[in-house]
Amino acid sequence: MLLIGSAWIVVNPVPSGPDEPAHYIRALAVAQGEFTGTPALISTQSPPPESTYIWNQTTRSFLLPASLAPGSMYACDAQDWSESAKCTSGPACARWAACLATPSTSGDVRLTTYEGVYEPTFYLIPGLFAHLANDSVNGLRAARLGQLLTAVALITAAGLLLWDERQSRFSLLGLLMAVTPMTLYMNTVVNPVGAEIVASLAFAATLLRIWRDGTGTSKLTWIAAGAFGCLCCIGRIEGPLWAAVAAASLVGLLGPREALATLRAGGRWAAFAVAAVVAGALLDEAWWHLVVSVPASLPGYGALDGLSKVTTVAGALVGLLEGQISGFGWDPGWISAGPFVSLAWGFMVTSLVTLALLVGRRRERIVIALLLCFDIAYTVGDGAVSSVVLGWGSTGVVGRLLLPLSVIPILVAGEVLCRNHERLRELVPQRLSLVLAVPAALCQGIALWMAARAYAVGLDGPLFFLRHSQWRPPFGWSPWLVITTLGCLAIVGAGWLQVGGPTDGAVAVPLVVDTP
């Protein structure tokens, strides 16, 4: 992830991520201790004019160092990849768009951002990295690096928690599938949604480790559960919900009695974990109700009006699922990684979940089924209500915002398969880790290539764009494509190494045996 992510950081033009300039302003402010800012009104250039009423409630202004500040909270390449990203190589006003005069590079400047009221948690590290740079372009890239390193740390922790030396062929399959190209991309641009995804992933992985270890759960695992759960809760407004879903999954997998016994066996460390998660949820509520005000819905509308949009969102489910795999840049008009990536990744996740449902015990199958049903129901409900009540229009939600929820059933399915794969005996490929690693690596590489092509020649340009490139990243395309290739080979290599890993030597259990 570090190799491919590093390539993404540089290959992505400055700026190009969804709402990235607005998030960058927020990160700069948080890093210098400005958490709330001054209320302000958004300009009429807001990308979704129908939701200006909401943005006016979330817009704040901050006093920032002029040398690091962007020219505005917009981007010249937002929502339109019919042309290359060559405008990002122009003067500051062209790059950031909406500038009326060349921005000053000395002293301080006051800028507004429509992302001004969101929790400061996931802005701090990117902002601190940005303050080490010498200008706005390098500042944004440094902030991206801070976001990537945070994600790498959380995903590494999740991998260590999920790793089982006795079942090395299967223990990381869920994690491999949860880190979609979109998960990786969102952690290489400045956007707290990326950190929200991996925080949810890390907390869910910790709870699955508790399920595996039961009453023998170690002190470090309980500490990790408290830390990651608290982080998940205070990252974004939906964080407490993601934490609650993950916790409910653990109780469902263990059963109420076993869950209580596990908590009692954990003693004060289990109490710390529970207290930390609850404290995180309370802090998040305090932020929205005491520090800033929860944005009010559009006047004249209520949640029931969203029912009219249910069929619209339900009909767009396939597109929303695709948006959790690819769909880079600002929306609408985002960059697709192509049908192969969406179909291949979707097929791999479906296969993983199907195998888990086949081998899982009754309770495990119920938990997976409930998680999938809740994921779909929440997607439709949230999209329908947001479309009307908040004025987002269309489906009311985009795929990347749903990834913090979707990673939970994927990880649960991976752990269920790891624990029960012997029930299928020879029907489960012993090289399954390699079978999934090869197309996963290919999808990650293709995703970056398709984004690079849009940046270089636009969406309508030639697929093999290197000789026709109108925009190039620093040092050209070659080093970043080589680094991406090395990262993809590392994924394949990891899958190959797991093929030869040991198993627990368990005797195959017939599928007719079905105990809770």
What label would you give each PLM region?
Residues 137-138, 159-181:
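Transmembrane-helix signature of polytopic, membrane-embedded enzymes
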Residues 270-281, 288-304, 428-516:
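Transmembrane helical bundles and short interhelical boundary loops of multi-pass, membrane-embedded
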Residues 34-140:
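Interfacial juxtamembrane loops and adjacent helix segments
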Residues 142-166:
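Transmembrane-helix motifs of polytopic, lipid-linked glycan transferases
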Residues 221-237, 241-248:
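Membrane-interface alpha helices of multi-pass inner-membrane proteins
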Residues 206-212, 242-278:
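Perimembrane helix-loop-helix junctions
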Residues 188-196:
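Short acidic/glycine- and proline-prone juxtamembrane loop motifs at membrane-interface regions
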Residues 261-360, 417, 467-484:
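Membrane-lumen/periplasm interface segments of multi-pass, membrane-embedded glycan/lipid transferases
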